[in-house]
Amino acid sequence: MALVCCTACSHVVGGQPIAGSDVHQAPAQGSSTAKWRDHVLPSDCLLTGAQMSALAGVEIDNGLDAETTNSDGSVGYSCNYYASAGGVLSFTAKIKVQSPSTGVVTEQLLADVGKPGATEVPGVGLRMIIEPVTAPSDFPTMRVADDKYLANVVLVVGNIPRPPDVAAWTRAANEILKALPA
């Protein structure tokens, strides 16, 4: 599952993998498209287990980098976090870090993707948004971007007591921004 970021209109959507490559293309709402690459850092594990535990509200072990083969044959890369009590069936969170296929992250690049109802948190990175959880199938999701990277954090709703509040997401976003390379 590829994830991409937000808009000035406080919108967010998930991207779709392009067959045969590690680039993810965000569905365009307008005429332009945004392309994102996975596996842009040695590790997507930008939060410690303790930091992810504070965000999720349950005890979580340190993350493990993982490759996933998508249905189209492309390979996705992310850091997976598991609840301390539960083993591999306790998958609780994921961080995926992406960067543009060319250039740097810009407002224009972020502007064409979105899901209605996202909350934009001002003053955190280039942009930080929290997706709404309005249906049982929705996962708590936060996206934060700086000029080089887009970090996507997804929590598994059935394995956490409740979605994080804005303050918890903001702490996690700031910790991620500090962990990203300059």
Predicted regions and their residues:
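Sec-dependent bacterial lipoprotein signal peptides
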Residues: M1-T7
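Bacterial signal peptide processing site
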Residues: T7-V13
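A small/polar (G/S/T-enriched), proline-flanked helix-loop surface module common
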Residues: V13-A182
